Amino acid sequence: MVGAEGRWREKGNDQRRGRKKRGGVEESGHRAAFLETAGTLKPNHRAGGASGHCPPSGGHFGNAAAPTARARPSGSAGHHRGLCQEEEDLSVVCGLSPAGVYSHPDHWPCCNHQDRECDCGRLLPRDYFAASIVFLSFGVVAAFCCAIVDSVFAARHIEPRPLSAGRCQFYSSGAGYLYDVYQTEVTCYSLNGRCQLKVRSNTCYCCDLYACGSTEPSPAYYEFVGVRSCQDVVHLYRLLWVSTVLNVLGLCLGIVTAAVLGAFKDMVPLSQLAYGPSPPPQILYNPAQQILAYTGLCPPSMGVPTCSSYPLPLQPSSAPPASASADLSLPEDTESPSQCQPSRGCSHAPSPCTPAYFLPGEKPPPYAP
């Protein structure tokens, strides 16, 4: 790649030196070849591979001077469209404008995206946007699940009122004991009497939440094992609600971000809207006047002549521009071609042109010699 780049630069330097000797009359050979290639491009065609005569990545075309107006071929005259609409032009240029020929951004130095398709001026390729939306969807689903789990756990299994009121006790069992190997029995008092509760070391227990003599488990946790104090349980309760709020916020932001990326993926560059191909002319048919009007081809101030019975596609090539549109069919009482004024260019001889075509369902006028 480095050797090819050096050869292209040496070729450009030799051509610049030769152009200076000849007074700047000749154009650069490689630039004229690229302009000729640009003039024969088709906007919607995509080729399978790169062009064989393209310069390597990082050539001197990024700083190429602006080509003169007379050097631009007829195929690209007046069009400031980007040449990156074809995959074969990806390794050559990004755009052709009065300012010059610009190399594609993928072939600037330190670029690692030289093999992707050209996306016509988008911020990122469509695949990147689609992958981002998919990963954001996974994050949105995960945030929703975490918010549900944290909120349900904090709301149903932790009762903060006895903890905040100081009605829970902490049992440590002394130093050197682990909470899973040392157990003791404590006495809890309730409305039904008193009962014995086995607790482990480093446990915060609440007798108000423990149902003495009941075989059904308590809906709320009455003991918390492996804490340093009962205040740690209060902190855990607050952290669960903070995690729920953050997960809900991440859920909303993920949905909004996915929507914005979807909008960016479907955006069209402003250059395509400004310099895109013009739409085909619309054909408007008025059954009352039997006239085919071609919008976009005829000026609105042009009058409709009365001496021609040929529509626009059937006019002879030598006809004047004033006869661009005419009646499709003539009734019996209308003026015949032999009654036209001589100043309008009509002759009494039969017209050598082909008769007009009529729309389906319409009756042609009778033959008049």
UniProtKB/Swiss-Prot annotation:
Residue ranges of coiled coil: none
Signal peptide: none
Spans annotated as Disordered: 1-80, 318-349
Cell compartment(s), UniProt: Membrane
PANTHER family: TRANSMEMBRANE PROTEIN 255B, TRANSMEMBRANE PROTEIN 255B-LIKE
Major location category of this protein: membrane
InterPro entries: TMEM255 (IPR028014)
Protein name: Transmembrane protein 255B
Biased composition (Low complexity): 318-329
UniProt keywords, alphabetically: Membrane, Transmembrane, Transmembrane helix
Family label: Belongs to the TMEM255 family.
Entry superkingdom: Eukaryota
UniProt keyword Acetylation present: no
Membrane-spanning intervals of the chain: 129-149, 244-264
GO cellular component, one term: membrane
Membrane topology of the entry: Multi-pass membrane protein
